[in-house]
Amino acid sequence: MQTYGNPNPTYGWWAGNAGTTNRSGKFLAAHIAHTGLMAFWAGSFTLFELSRYDPSVPMGHQPLVALPHLATLGIGVGDGGVITDTYPIVVTAVLHLVLSMVYAAGGLMHSLLFNGDIGEMGVKWARKFDFKWDDPDKLTFILGHHLFLLGLGNVQFVEWAKYYGLYDNAEGVVRTVVPNLNIGMVWNAQFNFLAINSLEDVMGGHAFLALFMMSGGLWHIVTKQAGEYTTFKGKGILSAEAQLSWALAGVGWMALVAAFWCASNTTIYPDTFFGEVLDLKFSISPYWVDTANLPEGTYTSRAWLTNIHYYLGFFYIQGHLWHALRALGFDFKRVSNAIGNADSATITLN
């Protein structure tokens, strides 16, 4: 974290990231525990939604988020997008709950039992992942593993679609999908991705994304910093604060893209599960409203999912700017001090 030259900074209880700044083992523990929280939410909320699901009301007109996403994967639904078998849904939920306990145990072990620094652990291969925030070689090595695993996730998604199928909103059935591997399609879609209306194109995009991510991951794993470590590559600003700012920028950008996609695209977000497409309105800030006739005080899943993605993305970007400026050395306390001293300031005209 930015210390502005103070060798012994202190942080408030709310600055949780500060406790993991120079302790790679604690940083890993926080990541594992966070994964456990996400898995617990996914499993528990799926069971909660399943207990409240009303088959007489369209899924998209109910306050659901987990069930619609499972339904798009063809889990538990049949023709017409109706839930026909709750067993695979329950299995998915329970699996997430079991994994959340495993992650929680891992987080606690790394936080309480294992060494606070990975470099001091007794396992040789684990020490390879020890890092310092200003060490580009170690950071690019770890980045490579992240990219490679994300690529494997894309491969898994493509293979699921090929062998188990996805829900096709145009046909109203769950069907297998063979990816369209035309690179021209992928290139053109980046300029008009909101209009994609083919599951084959969607899976083709994920297949190419898997290739790019895994190739980039291998590059970062087997190579060190190419060329001299210059300011352009982060020398002087490569820090925990800078890394946090870039992470917030990435998450914020993905949230904004998801908001626009969810608002208008019925291939990826079928109206059977998420409700009708939305209208974009403007007030103090942009917002989306339902086009369906719904009872007073009720909204489609698409409406609140779109709006919450947009506003979370907006504030993530603000967080990115805040931490990026701090990483560059800007001290926001100077702003508050300047405002506080405005009354006593004097202005001279020469």
Swiss-Prot record:
Any one GO CC term of the record: plasma membrane-derived thylakoid membrane
TM segment ranges: 27-47, 89-109, 141-161, 202-222, 244-264, 305-325
Entries under InterPro entries matching the protein: PS_antenna-like, PS_II_antenna-like_sf
SUPFAM superfamilies according to UniProt: Photosystem II antenna protein-like (SSF161077)
Keyword terms: Chlorophyll, Chromophore, Membrane, Photosynthesis, Photosystem I, Thylakoid, Transmembrane, Transmembrane helix
Localization per record: Cellular thylakoid membrane
GO biological processes: photosynthetic electron transport chain
Induction and repression of expression: By iron starvation.
Complex and partners: The antenna complex consists of divinyl chlorophylls (a and b) and divinyl chlorophyll a/b binding proteins. Under iron-starvation forms a complex with PSI, consisting of a PSI trimer surrounded by a ring composed of 18 PcbB subunits.
Family: Belongs to the PsbB/PsbC family. IsiA/Pcb subfamily.
Protein name: Divinyl chlorophyll a/b light-harvesting protein PcbB
Organism for this UniProt entry: Prochlorococcus marinus (strain MIT 9313)
